[in-house]
């Protein structure tokens, strides 16, 4: 029986990648049941034609669109995960272009290991400062086997019923740290966090085949110095019971 996967994409400032991202999602070896696009009102500086690209693109007729005239930020995609039709959910950042076997890769582990899967994995070296192991797991570290971590980002693959745990407690911020919050909430329910294999010689399994896009100038983590927010969210979740692997 084919897994029923709902995909949630975000449209905001990267219209140049959306068409390829949709193509790559639709070409998965385990095809998605549905693809939803959350359209956050982009900044006016983006320009009319680029904003239009976020709604009119190849295969747009195969994508369900939620169009907002306001930028609600990064939280809604996790909120809407409970309302989709699939048994599994995969949320993508708008800079993430998966290999064609990414869903297949995640499905090997999500139930067997009871784990949230992501394409970049971090293990913290401090419970008060945003210091992590280098390299990160995933397309950066190119791990040959599954690696359990504290935090995953860029793509999140999980069982739909786990989405409700995001709201066990309110996240500290609505503009940053949703990935940290979700991982911390899942831990309360015995759900681990992992980065599936990203072998050097098989990019079809990777969660993103163009990882450098995640550090461009419009990336939330790079658009300004977020170290203070990162520090605050980390300390908040640790104070509320989040246990870090190496500490």
Residue positions per predicted region:
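Glycine-rich, basic loop-to-helix element that forms the pyrophosphate-binding segment
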Residues: 68-83
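The conserved acidic donor/metal-binding loop of glycosyltransferases
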Residues: 93-97
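Conserved catalytic core of nucleotide-sugar-dependent glycosyltransferases
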Residues: 81, 99-170
């Amino acid at each position: 029986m084919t897994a029923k996967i709902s995909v949630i994409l975000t449209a905001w400032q990267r219209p140049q990648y959306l068409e390829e991202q949709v193509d790559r999602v639709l070409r998965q070896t385990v095809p998605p049941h549905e693809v939803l696009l959350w359209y956050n009102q982009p900044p006016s500086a983006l320009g009319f034609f680029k904003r239009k690209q976020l709604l009119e693109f190849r295969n747009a007729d195969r994508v369900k669109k939620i169009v907002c005239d306001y930028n609600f930020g990064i939280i809604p995609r996790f909120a809407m995960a409970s309302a989709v039709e699939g048994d599994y959910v995969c949320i993508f950042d708008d800079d993430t272009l998966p290999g064609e076997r990414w869903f297949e890769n995640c499905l090997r582990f999500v139930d067997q290991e009871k784990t949230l899967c992501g394409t970049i994995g971090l293990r913290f070296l401090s419970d008060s400062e945003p210091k992590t192991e280098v390299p990160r797991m995933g397309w950066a570290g190119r791990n040959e086997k599954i690696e359990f971590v504290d935090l995953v980002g860029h793509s999140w693959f999980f069982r739909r019923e786990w989405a409700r745990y995001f709201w066990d407690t309110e996240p500290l911020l609505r503009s940053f740290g949703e990935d940290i919050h979700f991982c911390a909430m899942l831990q309360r329910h015995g759900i681990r966090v992992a980065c599936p294999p990203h072998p050097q010689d098989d990019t079809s399994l990777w969660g993103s085949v163009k990882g450098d896009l995640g550090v461009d100038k419009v990336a939330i983590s790079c658009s300004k110095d977020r170290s203070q927010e990162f520090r605050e969210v980390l300390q908040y979740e640790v104070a509320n019971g989040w246990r870090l692997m190496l500490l």
